[in-house]
Amino acid sequence: MDVFKISVDTQQVHKITQENFDQVTKKQAPWYQPINGHQGWFAVCPACDNPIQIIGMLERDAPYGKHFFPTAGAVLVPLKGRVDKEEYEWCPYASKNKHLTKDDRRAAGSELAVLIKQTLIEQFDRVIYLLEKGTGMRISFALAKQMLEEYRAAEGWRYRGATRQNIPWVFAYMMQAKRLRGRIFFDAKFTEELLTRRPDLTWNANGQIDIKDDKKFCDLSFSFIRHRRHVDQYTLSESIEFNIANSKQETVCKREIVFEHDHFLKLINSKNEANRKINLVELARSVLA
């Protein structure tokens, strides 16, 4: 992996460089400590919260992190990560391109699952913001509530592909298909593509997708499918597909949404509370707490 954090309790994620590591750890233990007679650099995996060791900090232009499970007496000062071999097995940095299904579940009492759920509640307005940005579609209060209820029913926080970095997009991935008619789109290019493929539709003055002939039925629905994750060298990338399909399950339009891990983490670590929508946070708490 090419990123690290310094404890389970933080969501501040940093690129692995000597300068960044020194800046956030101030060269203190347990992040700096000897192992096997040599200097060691230790941190926490941002995805699974297990300890990691930084490899090649001084010898390589691009040092990287590797999961590390210390044997008794291997380190003098206990490391900050939470040792959990089961989380490690499904960590995107460990399993790399391992195929996931929604049925792959964490244990009900998983500490990481609890943290994912808690973060979703506390940051729900920012989750909705990023989903609207990625889809070009407004998510109404009513739709947000439906999505929360389906996330609760699916226990989405237990999905093996969920991490604290990808909360907005995995939240959407748990949603069942929803009807398209009446949804407000603000992405003109995507909307024009949809209308070209379905000339029976229109984009009304309110920005809503509607049907030209009120006597006819709009059979289109939208969903989020195909969660994919890939590690190239040491860098993780993830995506899902925003899919619009007809009643024959034929795709009419689709868009790949690449997970913006850095943007999400920047938002949740921001001290600026001015533009937050607390009514959405309260909604999430009422459904999930």
Question: Where are the language model's segments positioned?
Answer:
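Helix N-terminus capping/helix-initiation residues
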Residues: 17, 136-140, 259-262
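Extended hydrophobic/Leu-rich segments
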Residues: 16, 21-25, 140, 268, ...
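Residue-identity detector for glutamine
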Residues: 11-12, 18, 23, 28, ...
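Domain-exit/linker segments immediately C-terminal to small folded modules
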Residues: 71-181
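N-terminal cysteine/histidine-rich coordination modules
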Residues: 1-110
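Acidic-enriched, low-complexity/disordered segments with a strong bias for Aspartate over Glutamate
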Residues: 2, 9, 22, 49, ...
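Context-gated lysine
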Residues: 5, 15, 26-27, 66, ...
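Intrinsically disordered, low-complexity regulatory regions
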Residues: 145-289
